[in-house]
Amino acid sequence: IIYVGAMGDPFTENEHRGLYKSVDGGKNWKRILFSNNSSGIADLVMDPINPKKLFAALYQHKRTPYSFVSGGSGSGLFLSLDSGETWSKIGVNQGLPQGDLGRIGLAIAQSNPNRVYAKIEAKKNLLFRSDNGGTSWTVINSNPKFTNNRPFYFQDLAVDTQDEDRLYNIYQPLSVSYDGGKTFDPSPMIPADETKGIHADFHAMWINPKDPQHF
């Protein structure tokens, strides 16, 4: 089984956006989540113990030659408990912000799948946390230094594979929380003479599941 989250052509409204699923190794595909022709998938995470449980972040985003739209009614956080056959939208009743949302970054703890993080672009960019598998959410950090003022550009998160409280904020620079997102410290960086030619921005992170010091 393969899942692909597609943003589609960012310059046009089109039907190629959304979440797709293949059950035959990629030979055939079925779209299983879609909101509108301006919204695609910004992030997707799977419960490491229960692969039928998925969290998907839809993101309304459209480019123009000199600008872009980030956010709208097509954005949102969705939960499936049956491998994407049906979805429920997570919203205000579960603790998320009111109004239109933008880009959402997700991370689920391998050591405790009940711990899920979501960094959400809204009127005020906020870091949310769920400790019950996505049933309810609370704001864990509202400091703009870490929730950032460019959520359309930096919005990814990563969780230590053995410690649910160690959360990495993939930004500029990379920062790390040791208390489940409440506070962040700059992550020790590679010496400057070893990073020549490497751009300062961070957009993705892989953590070794057997050795979380290796990333």
Language-model region placement:
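Beta-propeller blade termini and top-face loops
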Residues: 1-215
